[in-house]
């Protein structure tokens, strides 16, 4: 602490260590707050899932003129309240709906496809009652068939905090349905 | 380069031994208190911003207290023995 330089270095280095301690405390307490609010068992409602399926011959869907791929557009209703995910350390929440299914040719592979997502920036707009909305992304598989197999639709969330790690979770309201077979004559050719 | 070395010698701003131990202990204690209060204030107001403001303001206060070589920090300068040859007067 003899010279100005030494005094400045001592104070600034200790202050840096202390700021890391503050950050660790903030991350830990906000995580405990989430556990206390029981957010890992949030409820949600996915209902009225319906689909329109077509045959795609384009290469980007993995199809060909001989063996077209089934591509499904999904519509659904969703009802969820994510305001409990917001505490003082939450920057924003990413909500997304996925479809999960096992492979047909490889029954032990689990596939997970995101069909809809939403960035929720504040607690005030965290309650959603969506009816009859289109999924943002279409649904198709490496295999040429997506219909007539059980698909489990789930709503997931992902908290992006100011300090600390990303926190992932899924809501309890999942729905398993089979998509309807496409009414199209192209497949028969 | 001579100029820079001169400038470096001018910017040392030394303080005496007692004040060195005093500034070290007070800056340590103050920073631990600031850590505690910035977390508590942020937790109670549920705002990261408040936490940061309390921490930075506290840090500025500590720097103002500790950094400058106030005249009070140089009151107990040790009296060094003369380094030159001492003249012993014959009796």
Curated annotation (Swiss-Prot), chain A:
TM region positions: 13-35
GO biological process: protein targeting to ER; signal peptide processing
Location within or outside the cell: Endoplasmic reticulum membrane
Keywords: Endoplasmic reticulum, Glycoprotein, Membrane, Signal-anchor, Transmembrane, Transmembrane helix
The keyword Transmembrane is assigned to this record: yes
Quaternary organization: Component of the signal peptidase complex (SPC) composed of a catalytic subunit SEC11 and three accessory subunits SPC1, SPC2 and SPC3. The complex induces a local thinning of the ER membrane which is used to measure the length of the signal peptide (SP) h-region of protein substrates. This ensures the selectivity of the complex towards h-regions shorter than 18-20 amino acids. SPC associates with the translocon complex.
Protein name (record): Signal peptidase complex subunit 3
Originating species: Kluyveromyces lactis (strain ATCC 8585 / CBS 2359 / DSM 70799 / NBRC 1267 / NRRL Y-1140 / WM37)
